[in-house]
């Protein structure tokens, strides 16, 4: 995997990369700095809801919005082998450069699950650690202390990462 990413000569000739730079443009443009009183920074942030106040990150399986329909059409057209969703954690203070959430590998099954769990995930984690980037798995904290434990986030089909594992 790391050789594939470093060496441009090994890229397949038919590789297609699709990027959606901002999925929730209405929320991104709705900037504020005072609605999260318990949060120290950032200076400005967007809003979870879109211009019609739909939380687009929780609309994938319901598809109540045009955004979700456009995503579904694009996803079905491209049929990606790999799907990556990056976004902020709504102000949670995790104290890490990056929190990551790989879908539960058993949702994928077969060779893809094995590749995700045994190759891609460990190689990415090791690569970031070797670059001195503090990383940790994304967990639900729900106002609990570390001593009482944390639960892993379940990416159900309402979220992009859960939705995309259905296909």
Please state what every model-predicted region is:
Residues 141-167:
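Hard-cation-handling environments
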Residues 1-121, 125-145:
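Active-site/substrate-binding loop(s) of hydrolase catalytic cores
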């Amino acid at each position: 995997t790391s050789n594939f990413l470093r060496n441009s000569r090994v890229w397949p000739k038919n590789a297609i990369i699709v990027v959606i730079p901002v999925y929730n443009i209405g929320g991104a443009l709705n900037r504020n700095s005072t609605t999260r009183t318990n949060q120290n920074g950032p200076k400005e942030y967007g809003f979870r809801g879109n211009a019609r106040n739909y939380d687009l990150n929780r609309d994938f399986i319901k598809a109540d919005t045009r955004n979700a329909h456009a995503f579904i059409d694009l996803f079905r057209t491209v049929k990606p082998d790999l799907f990556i969703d990056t976004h902020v954690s709504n102000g949670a203070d995790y104290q890490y450069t990056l929190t990551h959430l790989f879908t539960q590998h058993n949702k994928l099954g077969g060779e893809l699950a094995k590749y995700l769990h045994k190759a891609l995930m460990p190689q990415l984690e090791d690569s970031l650690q070797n670059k001195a980037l503090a990383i940790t798995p994304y967990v639900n904290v729900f106002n609990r202390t570390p001593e009482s434990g944390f639960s892993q986030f379940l990416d159900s089909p309402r979220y992009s990462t859960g939705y995309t594992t259905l296909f």
